[in-house]
Swiss-Prot record:
GO BP terms in the entry: long-chain fatty acid catabolic process
Organism whose genome encodes this protein: Homo sapiens
Protein name: Androgen-induced gene 1 protein
Keyword annotations of the record: Cell membrane, Hydrolase, Lipid metabolism, Membrane, Transmembrane, Transmembrane helix
Lineage: Eukaryota, Metazoa, Chordata, Craniata, Vertebrata
Entry's transmembrane regions: 13-30, 45-67, 88-110, 125-144, 157-179, 194-216
Catalytic activity: 9-hexadecanoyloxy-octadecanoate + H2O = 9-hydroxy-octadecanoate + hexadecanoate + H(+); 12-hexadecanoyloxy-octadecanoate + H2O = 12-hydroxyoctadecanoate + hexadecanoate + H(+); 9-(9Z-hexadecenoyloxy)-octadecanoate + H2O = (9Z)-hexadecenoate + 9-hydroxy-octadecanoate + H(+); 12-(9Z-hexadecenoyloxy)-octadecanoate + H2O = 12-hydroxyoctadecanoate + (9Z)-hexadecenoate + H(+)
Length: 238
């Protein structure tokens, strides 16, 4: 038996994301007042994705509780749709985008923090909030993947969706630069056009890789779980 029910964990994670978003939006930073506001940053978009995803998880839990034993076929159909949406969102957005934000942020930060998160931001963003945006995303999504089985979409549709998201965000970053004359991320100012194309192409490939990683990890976790349950059943059968 789990020490903490997964439903309680999801609710706690959802509340933590709501707190992080509220605290982040309350910060008065110059970048929030410029074109695109917070929506030009992938970190903020990811926070919204995670909050919406865990909101759907909590809604699914509540719906499952309310429909349990009711025998109402229409309610069961709606619950299945909600579960399908939850699974799709984890596969296509919550896992790949969340892992991408954590990995890329800390890799660039370790190399040269001024390229991704200038020291000036320490005057606006407290350390706990920075970790809430760029660190805890990973363990939270792994907890969700471990506590609930998620049905991935077909590989072609999943990869198409993550490619669409990646290209859409890249075009959005380029549009912000076109309008303001400034790149969203400082390191893009220091590389040439060719290097930017390579970087954008590499990030799209990385997003696809993370989608596949999530699929493999999900299958591994639940295939292992199934094998363990079958092993436990053997003595009973004997």
């Amino acid at each position: 038996m789990a020490l903490v029910p997964c439903q309680v964990l999801r609710m706690a994670i959802l509340l933590s994301y709501c707190s992080i978003l509220c605290n982040y939006k309350a910060i008065e930073m110059p970048s929030h007042q410029t074109y695109g506001g917070s929506w030009k940053f992938l970190t903020f978009i990811d926070l919204v994705i995670q909050a919406v995803f865990f909101g759907i998880c909590v809604l699914t839990d509540l719906s499952s509780l309310l429909t349990r034993g009711s025998g109402n076929q229409e309610q069961e159909r709606q619950l299945k749709k909600l579960i399908s949406l939850r699974d799709w969102m984890l596969a296509v957005l919550a896992f790949p985008v969340g892992v991408f934000v954590v990995a890329v942020f800390w890799i660039i930060y370790a190399y040269d923090r001024e390229m991704i998160y200038p020291k000036l931001l320490d005057n606006f963003i407290p350390g706990w909030l920075n970790h809430g945006m760029h660190t805890t995303v990973l363990p939270f999504i792994l907890i969700e993947m471990r506590t609930s089985h998620h049905q991935y979409p077909s590989r072609s549709s999943g990869l198409t969706a993550i490619c669409t998201f990646s290209v859409g965000y890249i075009l959005w970053v380029c549009w912000v630069h076109h309008v303001t004359g400034m790149w969203v991320y400082p390191f893009l100012e220091h590389i040439g056009p060719g290097a930017r194309i390579i970087f954008f192409g590499s990030t799209t490939i990385l997003m696809n890789f993370l989608y596949l990683l999530g699929e493999v990890l999900n299958n591994y976790i639940w295939d292992t779980q199934k094998s363990m349950e079958e092993e436990k059943e053997k003595p009973k059968l004997e």
